[in-house]
């Protein structure tokens, strides 16, 4: 009788141990998923995917919406074209503008398709997904999202975003030298704002503001009106944007001691050099 009782106790222990058994799956990202053995009927491994990455490029973004135009959003956005069997997908990834996947058609260097873009809420809320379309070439792709901020267009570009990094408004006091003599150098009364506008990857415009200088020798007060120097191209040898503009027909208003006149830059020495610093 004692042996039978012992066997019953052992059998119950084995059953309890079996019921408590778990299966732990260790994922490649360091996390774990644990299941009770009773929850698993079988484990099947799916066949290897036939997805192939054809192209993957990193480029810069210019984004427009109902609230802003052509705003530069860095140069780390990635576009990847994937072949899945006989179909093609394009994957978009950017830290600010989210992640998108599109079913696309490739035709003689052009790309077009439909899909969606999922964006993380910068305020910490839930992410949102938006229907979107894609079109362009392998170096310039446009993603259109109609229901985001009154209509949002994300332009992805493969190339050097140097001009867009340089674009912006720069504030400081300016100096003028009268007659080419260093002793007759004067600063503006207040800080002024110079504006650099990107035309394309390697060309900028420079908007020079109205500037006021007081008590110039033999001239009195001087006010120079605003003007724009256009199409200043990147010069690799100078490591700067350079343009001689004496023959561009640029005019400006100038008031000297209360007398206003209209003038044109015609001197062959008229030259502008815009040299970006390390961060653009």
Show where each model-derived region lies:
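C-terminal trimerization/auto-chaperone modules of long, extracellular attachment fibers and adhesins
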Residues: 23-29
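Structured surface patches comprising rigid loops and adjacent beta-strands/short helices at the edges
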Residues: 36-45
């Amino acid at each position: 009788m004692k042996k039978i009782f012992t066997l019953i106790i052992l059998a119950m222990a084995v059953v309890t141990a079996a019921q408590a058994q778990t299966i732990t799956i260790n994922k490649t990202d360091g996390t774990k998923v644990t299941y009770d053995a009773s929850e698993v009927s079988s484990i099947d491994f799916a066949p290897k995917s036939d997805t192939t990455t054809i192209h993957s490029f990193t480029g810069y973004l210019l984004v427009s919406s109902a609230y802003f135009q052509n705003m530069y959003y860095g140069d780390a956005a990635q576009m990847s074209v994937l072949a899945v069997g006989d179909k093609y997908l394009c994957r978009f990834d950017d830290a600010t503008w989210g992640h998108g996947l599109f079913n696309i058609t490739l035709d003689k260097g052009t790309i077009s398709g439909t899909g969606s873009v999922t964006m993380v809420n910068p305020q910490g809320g839930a992410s949102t997904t938006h229907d979107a379309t894609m079109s362009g070439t392998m170096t310039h792709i446009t993603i259109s999202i109609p229901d985001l901020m009154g209509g949002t267009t994300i332009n992805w570009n493969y190339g050097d975003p140097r001009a867009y990094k340089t674009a912006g408004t720069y504030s400081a006091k300016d100096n003028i030298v009268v007659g080419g003599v260093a002793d007759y150098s004067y600063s503006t009364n207040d800080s002024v704002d110079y504006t650099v506008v990107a035309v394309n990857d390697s060309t900028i415009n420079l908007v020079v503001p109205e500037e006021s200088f007081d008590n110039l020798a033999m001239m009195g007060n001087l006010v120079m009106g605003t003007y724009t120097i256009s199409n200043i191209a990147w010069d690799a040898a100078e490591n700067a944007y350079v343009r001689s503009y004496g023959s561009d027909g640029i005019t400006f208003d100038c008031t000297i001691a209360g007398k206003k006149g209209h003038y044109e830059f015609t001197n062959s020495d008229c030259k502008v050099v815009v040299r970006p610093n390390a961060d653009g």
